[in-house]
Amino acid sequence: MTAQIIDGKALAEELRQGFKARVEALTAKGHKPGLVVILVGADPASEVYVRNKVNGCLAIGMHSEKITYDATIDQATVLNKIAELNADPNIHGILVQLPLPKHFDEEAVLEAISAEKDVDGFHAENVGALAQGNPRFIPCTPYGVMKMFEKGNVDLTGKEAVVIGRSNIVGKPMALLLINAGATVTVCNSRTKDLKFHTSRADILVAAVGKPKFVTGDMVKPGAVVIDVGINRLPDGKLCGDVDFASCLEVAGQITPVPGGVGPMTITMLLANTIEAAERKAGL
């Protein structure tokens, strides 16, 4: 068996083409969607992510800007800027690129963003709404994964789903979305005993652990849908995911590649959330 590859890059482009008409309609009514990304420090990976987010917005006609601070900036300055952006009617989405320098209280910064402009879906109010099954904004990576399930005609109802990783950014919201979709969900972490026992029973396997090629083919149930959220850079400079693609490709029914899988969908759903925020503000 050779798995069907779920092409996240192609799906992302298809969705973005559809977004253009929504952006044009909003702009014509004086509600051009606007996203501001705040970057503290000069982490090379974060700079790439921020550039891709800003360029993604501009490519479909949205307004976007990057605000950069030196890593030594005090937290109060950033909080004051967030308060200013919260009050700006032309800005519909505010995103603070993580991680922040160690002297920052990450939770306090994320909570300072208005829940109505929290397009990352990290504000406690939005996390609670997601847990209740009535989300305002879905965190972008899990949102992208759900769109991939939708595109691949993956029926989640009654399926055994295993999520490896329990981060607030991916693992926890991913588990909630799967629960809300009717799956039976197990969340595994670094302390899980006999991980293979759980993964080998999974109809849906989501790997978000941050370890290169961590999930191997012998851990996968034949015919399973394998979603690789990881992005890891190897010593030779190449990118790979948390899944050993070659071995899992021969066992899985559907699988996402790295690169070209979940990654492009993450930024695409950030655009979706920002457009949705603008539509709500416009009463559409």
From Swiss-Prot:
Keywords: Amino-acid biosynthesis, Histidine biosynthesis, Hydrolase, Methionine biosynthesis, Multifunctional enzyme, NADP, One-carbon metabolism, Oxidoreductase, Purine biosynthesis. The keyword NADP applies. One of its GO terms (biological process) is methionine biosynthetic process. NADP(+) binds at residues 165-167, 190, 231. GO terms for molecular function: methenyltetrahydrofolate cyclohydrolase activity; methylenetetrahydrofolate dehydrogenase (NADP+) activity. It catalyses: (6R)-5,10-methylene-5,6,7,8-tetrahydrofolate + NADP(+) = (6R)-5,10-methenyltetrahydrofolate + NADPH; (6R)-5,10-methenyltetrahydrofolate + H2O = (6R)-10-formyltetrahydrofolate + H(+). InterPro entries: Aminoacid_DH-like_N_sf, NAD(P)-bd_dom_sf, THF_DH/CycHdrlase, THF_DH/CycHdrlase_cat_dom, THF_DH/CycHdrlase_CS, THF_DH/CycHdrlase_NAD-bd_dom. Pathway: One-carbon metabolism; tetrahydrofolate interconversion. The keyword NADP applies. Its EC number is 1.5.1.5, 3.5.4.9. One of its GO terms (cellular component) is cytosol. Belongs to the tetrahydrofolate dehydrogenase/cyclohydrolase family. NCBIfam families: PRK10792.1 (NF008058), PRK14186.1 (NF010783), PRK14189.1 (NF010786). Homodimer. Catalyzes the oxidation of 5,10-methylenetetrahydrofolate to 5,10-methenyltetrahydrofolate and then the hydrolysis of 5,10-methenyltetrahydrofolate to 10-formyltetrahydrofolate. This is Bifunctional protein FolD.
